[in-house]
Amino acid sequence: MRCIVLAAGMGVRMNSKYAKVTHTVCGKPMIRWILDTVLNLLDKVCVVVGHDADSVKKLLPENVEVVHQSQQLGTGHAVMSARNFIDPADNLLILYGDMPLITEGTIQKIINSHNLSNCDATVVSVEMNDPTGYGRIVRDKSGKFVKIVEESEASNREKAIVEVNTGVYIFNGRKLLEVLPMINCKNKKGEYYLTDVFAFLERVNIYKSERSCEFIGINNRIQLAQAEKFRRQWILEELMIKGVTIVDPETTYIDADVKIGRDSIIYPMSFIHGDTKIGEDCIIGPMTRIIDSYIGDRVTIVRSECKGARIMSDVSVGPFSRLREGTVLCNGVKIGNFVEIKNSEIDQNTKAQHLTYLGDAVVGKSVNIGAGTITCNFDGKRKNQTVIEDEVFIGSNTALVAPVKVEKGAFVAAGSTINRNVPAWSLAIARARQEIKLNWVIDKRKKEED
């Protein structure tokens, strides 16, 4: 069996400059949801592109064929554009690219139903409480297929039908090639409707699915949000079945490609996106955002943001920390409140607990970074590196003016501005000497009174 995915539409009701199928559901473009599902079952897949074709093509895997529909003149015209892909000796599955919820199991059931029916085509239908916008399935008194009528062409009686066409079909390839030239665009929209081919087919099977949620088509941002909610629920349920605790699924947002180990706990208002992997026995949240990051085992991240970071095991982050791209935290590191780290590697058992900025830094093992420490990494033209070797103690309110190195075991006194390298096991003090003027306040007040 072959498959054509229709992805040429502009999606006017999305009110977007981007092709409809490029919009994401749980971090994955709609077109990739449908293709990843289909390619698990079939290896011959063609995608029909049109509006914003280049953007759509960038999202397609290499093992699919691409056909360009130069004018968007309806679903029938889209299939005509791909007629060279249709094999008369093979069946053809047709799907829309804006159906990100359809599952592999449902597609397999549709295929099985068609194979058992010995019919020219199979139409997939569902019942909807509100069928507005969908073509209606018209049956005869015995329940057999009569026709599909598009809503714009339907009578009031036909509009009252709640069994709708999902836009998913299987055709006998030879039959479809025979009847495609018979359809025309003599209708209110001036389009070639693929549904018109059924008037020329004698044997049509109907597969009525009980899972209407899988066939939600995305035509506007409201439906996009509805699809996101369904898919998010399925993602969270799968994680919970695999041993992850989701404290409040209603306020937890996890993308499709995220991996989380068992016995980890995800607290409310956590947003975990992109290519993120979280190990076992972790505590994430509440109010935490993680993007494209690796997190080892037994890591705690509270009220913080991580993007493009690598965090090894037994690390504590937060609250109110920000880990930016290029951050690496090795085993046992502790990052506390209001700490920002960018493009820096922090070695084992080092602590930066309060009010710190580390940018473009290499920090060794068992280092203590005092509150208020900053690396002055930008000189106005380029970023410079700060190196802090093992067992260094950096006192509070220290400014490290890069490029600079603090060698092993050195101490930097609180309040210092360090702009020269500090030798190993040395004490660096770079601040003005304190001066005390006894009774200065009393003398000042006396002068003011005179």
UniProtKB/Swiss-Prot annotation:
Gene Ontology cellular component list: cytoplasm; membrane
Region (Linker): 222-242
Cofactor binding note from Swiss-Prot or TrEMBL: Binds 1 Mg(2+) ion per subunit.
Region named N-acetyltransferase: 243-450
Binding site for UDP-N-acetyl-alpha-D-glucosamine: 6-9, 20, 69, 74-75, 96-98, 135, 150, 165, 219, 324, 342, 357, 368
Catalyses which reaction(s): alpha-D-glucosamine 1-phosphate + acetyl-CoA = N-acetyl-alpha-D-glucosamine 1-phosphate + CoA + H(+); N-acetyl-alpha-D-glucosamine 1-phosphate + UTP + H(+) = UDP-N-acetyl-alpha-D-glucosamine + diphosphate
CDD domains: GT2_GlmU_N_bac (cd02540), LbH_GlmU_C (cd03353)
InterPro entries associated with the record: Bifunctional_GlmU, GlmU-like, GlmU_C_LbH, Hexapep, Hexapep_transf_CS, MobA-like_NTP_Trfase, Nucleotide-diphossugar_trans, Trimer_LpxA-like_sf
Subunit note: Homotrimer.
Protein's name according to its UniProt entry: Bifunctional protein GlmU
